[in-house]
Amino acid sequence: MKKLLLTSLVALGLSISANAADKSKTIIVGATPIPHAEILEVVKPILAKDGYTLEIKEFNDYTTPNLATEDGDLDANFFQHLPYLDEFNKNKGTHLIKTVGVHLEPMGVYSKKIKDIKDLKDGSTVSIPNDPTNESRALDILANAGLIKLNDNPLKTPLDIVDNPKKLKFEEIETAQVPRTLDDVTIAVINTNYALNANLNPVKDALVLESKNSPYVNYVVVKSGNENSPKIKALDKAINSSEVKKFIEIKYNGAILPAF
């Protein structure tokens, strides 16, 4: 009986050790489907060479993956730029930090009603994201296109428009839902990941495309304190590899730009 008990305890100990080893070699990353999860699929075999298993969890919003990373359900996430991350930490009290930059997604202005931004009529309706950083970013694009003028506030809303010569009307929409408004508005300012998901080609379809000098690089994000763990270091190295850079350049053909 004692021998049986000892054998069972040894087996249990081995099982626990194996599970701990498996966890240390498994990297769970949350991402939006396009392009982030697509890029992570390229990272999988690179990490496998170093003995790591990459699990990709897909999300269709910008809130859940950050909360899951804060809570430890994800080792990292990959979907956001630094202004959004900073604003999220401030509003939610989270402790998330960036590690490496991966790519830039130039935001664009799209329409099913007009073919050229010069054809935009007075009183047209414009849909823009409603989260603070992407809303401000969208308004900056419209200002750079000469459609409106803004004050100097760092984060802008339609209330910060100081000149609106075309008397444009603005609808603030949840970021992921902006592409769905294209049938109802004249123009929509859409994040590139959601544009691609809606089968829009930023290079061919955007009436206005954000400057390539935009500061909105997308980063790998982890909870503070985890940035130097072996598996995060392995993830950072793999996602900044030449294989990933080549994939971004070929797959997205200028719609998305490598940032390393």
Map each language-model feature to its residues.
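Periplasmic-binding protein-like
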Residues: E135-A143, I239-A259
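A conserved helix-loop-strand patch within extracytoplasmic ligand-binding domains
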Residues: T99-I148, K245
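Ligand-binding "clamshell"
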Residues: E87-T99, I114, D184, V189, ...
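Short, well-ordered beta-strand elements
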Residues: K23-I34, Y52-E58, T125-V126
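Short helix-initiation/N-cap motifs at beta->coil->alpha
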Residues: I56-L67, P154-R180
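A bilobed periplasmic-binding-protein/Venus flytrap-type ligand-binding module shared by bacterial periplasmic
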Residues: P106-I117, V217-S229
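Immediate post-signal peptide segment of exported/extracytoplasmic ligand-binding proteins
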Residues: A18-I28, L47-A48, D116-G123
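Beta->alpha turn/N-cap motifs
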Residues: E58-Y62, G72, A76-D86, H103, ...
